[in-house]
């Protein structure tokens, strides 16, 4: 297919009223990516040189999302009136008129669309078809338009209400997705009339129009997941489950161990190397890369972070955006790391917050250590040198530097830099008063008794 040019027209103008949301339907997410983003990726993977998004409801929000996505060529067209699918496709007339070998028509609410089925439809065009319609076989075909075939040709798409008793027995159904030969696309769609009860222009009419002109029209079969759109929150959750199950399997087959795969939740761009172990109940947000041989313990939450080879994270750890856990470093239980580099072999084992910081190679951060990075207006950096030892329950008030090999005594609050190999105390000297504990206890007990008696 490399020598055939292709335009994908993505219909994303639907109202999406059944989602009951102020957010446009196509911007609801599967695996951390907007549904229309999945469709754009599928079209690009199927060889589309250019994308034309037709937007309507929430046009500015959809436009803002689409413009952030990478594409060799991406155009956005607004469908001002909702007059049917053929009318929607013609909103992208400018893009179609540039002259592509293949034109794909897909929907922005089909997040599970597999690039392979689009490639299969394009292959039909390469073999001489003018139109290739994507069909599927649902367990119960009720409600779907039927694909009527005769001697290997698709002769009509019949809505169920218009089907004969014999046609209702057909289980091959219309998904709405089409591939159209570019040289015929505009001519065919321009002939669609709105002579129906709703007064709309239906793209499916081009099947019969093409047949009347003696052009070859065929059907290409896809799995149900690729063919079904999302209309409400329940279907969104079902699609999420299907997507997650598929992605988990791909990771396991690539050499990643998921101890309880059904409890691990991934994002569209999650990267995990072989020989990494993921324990139960781990959540990956967008922007995560885990190298080979890492170990992510249970109940960890990771987003926009990098974990390098041999590092361990968790249990109950949170890596926020900008966290870098380098080779053989350790992030232990109930730790939060944000915009910080934990260098090779460094340890943050328990109950710590490390934000806007660098922790040098081999450094050890005691339990309860906090980098105080925010003064109410700005974030400030904490630098902890290689091999430094930070005692438990210490507060490092940024901006501050702890030199390589330095020791910080437990319970310290440090506001000044500590030189390399120095020992720093940032707490008041302990004072002990013999017998005063009993005096205080007796006094407080007497006051309590007076209040109780009153």
Curated annotation (Swiss-Prot):
E.C. numbers: 2.7.7.23, 2.3.1.157
Cofactor requirement: Mg(2+)
InterPro entries: Bifunctional_GlmU (IPR005882), GlmU-like (IPR050065), GlmU_C_LbH (IPR038009), Hexapep (IPR001451), Hexapep_transf_CS (IPR018357), MobA-like_NTP_Trfase (IPR025877), Nucleotide-diphossugar_trans (IPR029044), Trimer_LpxA-like_sf (IPR011004)
Residues reported in the UniProt entry to bind Mg(2+): 109, 231
Residues binding UDP-N-acetyl-alpha-D-glucosamine: 11-14, 25, 79, 84-85, 145, 159, 174, 231, 320, 338, 353, 364
Annotated spans, Linker: 234-254
MF-aspect GO terms: glucosamine-1-phosphate N-acetyltransferase activity; magnesium ion binding; UDP-N-acetylglucosamine diphosphorylase activity
Record keywords, A-Z: Acyltransferase, Cell shape, Cell wall biogenesis/degradation, Cytoplasm, Magnesium, Metal-binding, Multifunctional enzyme, Nucleotidyltransferase, Peptidoglycan synthesis, Repeat, Transferase
Cofactor stoichiometry and binding remark: Binds 1 Mg(2+) ion per subunit.
Coiled coil (residue ranges): none
Major location category of this protein: cytoplasm
Segments of this protein annotated with the region N-acetyltransferase: 255-454
Catalytic site: 350
Subunit structure: Homotrimer.
Family to which this protein belongs: In the N-terminal section; belongs to the N-acetylglucosamine-1-phosphate uridyltransferase family. In the C-terminal section; belongs to the transferase hexapeptide repeat family.
Function: Catalyzes the last two sequential reactions in the de novo biosynthetic pathway for UDP-N-acetylglucosamine (UDP-GlcNAc). The C-terminal domain catalyzes the transfer of acetyl group from acetyl coenzyme A to glucosamine-1-phosphate (GlcN-1-P) to produce N-acetylglucosamine-1-phosphate (GlcNAc-1-P), which is converted into UDP-GlcNAc by the transfer of uridine 5-monophosphate (from uridine 5-triphosphate), a reaction catalyzed by the N-terminal domain.
The name this protein goes by in its record: Bifunctional protein GlmU
Organism field: Chelativorans sp. (strain BNC1)
Gene field: glmU
């Amino acid at each position: 297919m490399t020598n055939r040019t292709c335009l994908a027209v993505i219909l994303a103008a639907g109202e999406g009223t059944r989602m009951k949301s102020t957010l446009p339907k196509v911007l609801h997410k599967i695996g951390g990516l907007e549904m229309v983003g999945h469709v754009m990726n599928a079209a690009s993977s199927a060889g589309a040189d250019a994308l034309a998004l037709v937007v309507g409801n929430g046009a500015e929000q959809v436009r803002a999302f689409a413009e952030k996505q990478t594409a060799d060529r991406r155009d956005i067209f607004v469908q001002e009136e909702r007059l049917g699918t053929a009318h929607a496709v013609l909103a992208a007339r400018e893009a179609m008129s540039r002259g592509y070998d293949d034109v794909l028509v897909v929907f922005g609410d089909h997040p599970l669309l597999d690039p392979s089925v689009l490639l299969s439809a394009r292959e039909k065009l390469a073999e001489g078809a003018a139109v290739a319609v994507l069909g599927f076989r649902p367990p119960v075909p009720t409600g779907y338009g039927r694909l009527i075939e005769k001697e290997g040709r698709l002769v009509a798409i019949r809505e169920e209400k218009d089907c004969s008793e014999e046609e209702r027995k057909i289980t091959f159904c219309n998904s709405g997705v089409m591939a159209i030969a570019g040289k015929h696309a505009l001519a065919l769609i321009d002939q669609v009339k709105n002579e129906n009860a709703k007064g709309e222009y239906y793209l499916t009419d081009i099947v019969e129009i093409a047949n009347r002109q003696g052009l070859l029209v065929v059907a290409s079969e896809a799995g149900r997941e690729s063919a079904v759109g999302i209309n409400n929150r329940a279907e969104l959750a079902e699609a999420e489950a299907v997507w997650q199950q598929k992605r988990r399997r791909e990771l396991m087959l690539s050499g990643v161990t998921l101890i309880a795969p059904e409890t691990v939740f991934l994002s569209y761009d999650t990267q995990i190397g072989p020989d990494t172990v993921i324990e139960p109940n781990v959540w990956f947000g967008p922007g995560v890369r885990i190298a080979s041989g890492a170990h992510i313990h249970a109940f960890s939450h990771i987003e926009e972070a990098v974990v390098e080879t041999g590092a361990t994270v968790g249990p109950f750890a949170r890596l926020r955006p900008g966290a870098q856990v380098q080779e053989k470093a350790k992030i232990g239980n109930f730790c939060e790391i944000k915009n910080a580099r934990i260098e090779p072999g460094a340890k943050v084992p328990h109950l710590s917050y490390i934000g806007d910081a660098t922790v040098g190679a081999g450094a050890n951060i005691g339990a309860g250590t906090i980098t105080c990075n925010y003064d109410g207006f700005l974030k400030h950096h904490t630098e902890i040198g290689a091999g430094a030892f930070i005692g438990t329950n210490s507060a490092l008030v940024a901006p501050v530097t702890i030199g390589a090999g330095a020791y910080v005594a437990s319970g310290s609050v440090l506001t000044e830099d500590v030189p390399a190999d120095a020992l720093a105390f940032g707490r008041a000297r302990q004072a002990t008063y013999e017998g005063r504990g009993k005096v205080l206890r007796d006094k407080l007990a007497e006051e309590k008794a007076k209040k109780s008696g009153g």
